[in-house]
Amino acid sequence: MPRKGHIAKRDVLPDPVYNSKVVTKLINNVMEDGKKGVAQKICYDAFQIINEKTGRDAMEVFEEAMNNIMPLLEVKARRIGGANYQVPIEVRPERRQTLGLRWLLAASRKRGEKYMRERLAGELMDAANNTGAAVKKREDTHKMAEANKAFAHYRY
């Protein structure tokens, strides 16, 4: 925590093709070793694959997928009287988006397709259909929160 007050959030510029800040964040998360051009190509190619395979607008599929991935609740460890409790808490909107993108990319990277553009497109289409590893991660997180509902009164 900083000693000199609050640090302002840096604003992300919307991407040039879809004019969306969320797509910019996706590109920034896909990026490795500062290679933004490569990351943009991967994302835009994945969106092109989605357009071809589904016949729907890629942004629609992307937004639907993100809504199916982003968690509403998560658990946070809290130490009380020598015991650690998993306390369910609501997730702030900014963190919801961050976790959604993180889980989407983790699930994409674990997939079996040869190219990242295909893995990302596949995971986005699966998530839009409420299947896939990223959606399962969200369901598991919600189950953990539900199972530990009894400790909700220890909330921060």
Curated annotation (Swiss-Prot):
The record's subunit annotation is: Part of the 30S ribosomal subunit. Contacts proteins S9 and S11.
**Does Phosphoprotein count among this protein's keywords?**
no
Cross-referenced NCBIfam families: rpsG_bact
Give the Pfam families listed for this entry: Ribosomal_S7 (PF00177)
Return the Gene3D superfamilies for the record: Ribosomal protein S7 domain
Family named by the database record: Belongs to the universal ribosomal protein uS7 family.
A Gene Ontology biological process in which this protein takes part is: translation
> What does the record give as the function of this protein?
One of the primary rRNA binding proteins, it binds directly to 16S rRNA where it nucleates assembly of the head domain of the 30S subunit. Is located at the subunit interface close to the decoding center, probably blocks exit of the E-site tRNA.
Q: Which residues form the signal peptide?
A: none
Under the heading InterPro entries, the entry gives: Ribosomal_uS7, Ribosomal_uS7_bac/org-type, Ribosomal_uS7_CS, Ribosomal_uS7_dom, Ribosomal_uS7_dom_sf
In its UniProt record, a GO molecular function of this protein is: rRNA binding
Q: What is this protein called?
A: Small ribosomal subunit protein uS7
GO cellular component, alphabetical, reads: small ribosomal subunit
Keyword terms: Ribonucleoprotein, Ribosomal protein, RNA-binding, rRNA-binding, tRNA-binding
Q: Does the keyword Hydrolase apply?
A: no
